[in-house]
Amino acid sequence: VITNGEEKIGGGGEKCFPTISIVDPDFMMTVPPHLTAYQGFDAFFHAAEGYLAKTANPMSDMFTLQAIALIGKSLAAAVKDGSNADARADVALANTLAGFVETLSSCSGEHAIEHALSAFHPKLPHGAGLIMISKAYWSRFKDTSADRLQAIAHALGRADGDFLAALAELQQACGVDKLRLSDYGVKPEDAGELADNAASTMGALFRVDPRTLSREEIMDIITESI
């Protein structure tokens, strides 16, 4: 166990890839509803961020929309009834596909911001933090990445292509739409330090955003989510 206070960074390498991996949804049946939602949204954002990022490519795109469609179809059902075998299988497959996307493309600045939040507030679950900042973060790219956001919305089943509305609907269906950073002690005056921490520890993720967010924008994303 490696512990660095107030720092949550990424890690990886060739040795992290298993020779074989067995993903068995039967082992997930007893995961509590709130953790099912949090981890399901983490998988969703792995896929969606990889699709948004400058590093997106034909290989990562092969898996993105299928992962998102499975989450849109079955995450809420898995949250409501953890013993729903079909829903659990869909979400497990979506999570696996989203992992392919994360590897072939990249996560984006959304993950960098959340890592800073969890570093300073260790009781904040990672997936919950992503949910909390998601609307503020994704709204920054509604003009620069309209086509890709529409494709994600369509994969979620939103016919009009309104990504932010589709995101809000999925969060509401999973019962996580009311989460706020203030629930975990984040204060507006913390925004500057959190933004600086995100940039210094996970700054590479901001560089794959469709456009570079300013320090002030990162601070605004945090304060809007409090």
Task: Identify what each model region corresponds to.
Residues V1-P58:
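A glycine/threonine-rich phosphate-anchoring loop and its flanking beta-alpha core
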